[in-house]
């Protein structure tokens, strides 16, 4: 049985919702799944004033534990076509894991949320640079997910990874097609991790 970590940052809860769907998909493939988040770097009063969702159930991950998993699915909001600063800050502290090759051969995948749909693909592909430097096996979503080709509804996601479009004011929540893509990505990554790591 493979061990899968779903590691995310979510300011308003959209990525948190996707993370839960990703985890559900990975569990459906028979993997042991843990959901964790990266630390918030914004002062609490500033986050509160911005309307951030501060009551997220997932515990905060430690850097060292990343090496304990066969696959890691990373979730982040899009910030100007890049990952959120909180995720970047966390990953910038993984130098010792890189130096010791502790993530080499582990499966890595990314899902995202964006306000208006802009930057989701560049967020994922720029995230892949970090995964490649760690020697991770990068896995996208693929067009095998039938919801990806469904043009009857507005949705986030691409062959690079699942996603949601939150709307400019953040009021739009992930729809069923977006959650289905997230579940598919979790299952897909877990199945590949099982093939690679037993």
UniProtKB/Swiss-Prot annotation:
- Which residues does substrate bind? 98
Alphabetized, the UniProt keywords read: Flavoprotein, FMN, NAD, NADP, Nucleotide-binding, Oxidoreductase
Cofactor notes: Binds 1 FMN per monomer.
Q: Which residues bind NAD(+)?
A: 12
* Cofactors named for this entry: FMN
E.C. number: 1.6.5.2
Annotated Flavodoxin-like domain ranges read 4-189
Gene Ontology cellular component?
membrane
Catalytic activity line of the entry: a quinone + NADH + H(+) = a quinol + NAD(+); a quinone + NADPH + H(+) = a quinol + NADP(+)
Q: Where does FMN bind?
A: 10-15, 78-80, 113-118, 133
Q: What class of enzyme is it?
A: oxidoreductase
**PROSITE patterns membership:** FLAVODOXIN_LIKE
Recorded GO MF terms:
flavin adenine dinucleotide binding; FMN binding; NAD binding; NADH:ubiquinone reductase (non-electrogenic) activity; NADP binding; NADPH dehydrogenase (quinone) activity
Q: Which domain of life is it from?
A: Bacteria
Read off the Pfam families from this record. Answer: FMN_red
Q: Key word Zinc present in the record?
A: no
| Protein family per UniProt | Belongs to the WrbA family.
| NCBIfam families given in the database record | flav_wrbA, PRK03767.1
- What protein name is recorded for this chain? NAD(P)H dehydrogenase (quinone)
Give the organism, scientific name: Halorhodospira halophila (strain DSM 244 / SL1)
């Amino acid at each position: 049985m493979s061990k899968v970590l779903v590691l995310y940052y979510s300011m308003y809860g959209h990525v948190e919702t996707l993370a839960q769907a990703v985890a559900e998909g990975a569990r459906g493939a028979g993997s042991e799944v843990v959901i964790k988040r990266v630390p918030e770097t914004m002062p609490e009063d500033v986050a509160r004033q911005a309307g951030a969702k501060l009551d997220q159930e997932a515990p905060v991950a430690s850097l060292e534990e990343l090496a304990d998993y066969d696959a890691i699915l990373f979730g982040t909001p899009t910030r100007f076509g890049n990952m959120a600063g909180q995720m970047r800050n966390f990953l910038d502290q993984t130098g010792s894991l890189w130096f010791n090759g502790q993530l080499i051969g582990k499966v890595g995948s990314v899902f995202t949320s964006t306000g208006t749909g802009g930057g989701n693909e560049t967020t994922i592909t720029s995230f892949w640079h970090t995964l490649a430097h760690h020697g991770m096996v990068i896995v996208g979503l693929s067009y095998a997910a039938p919801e990806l080709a469904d043009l009857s509804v507005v949705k986030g996601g691409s062959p690079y990874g699942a996603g949601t479009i939150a709307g400019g004011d953040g009021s739009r929540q992930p729809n069923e097609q977006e959650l289905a893509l997230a579940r598919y990505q979790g299952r897909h990554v877990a199945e590949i991790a099982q093939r690679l790591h037993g």
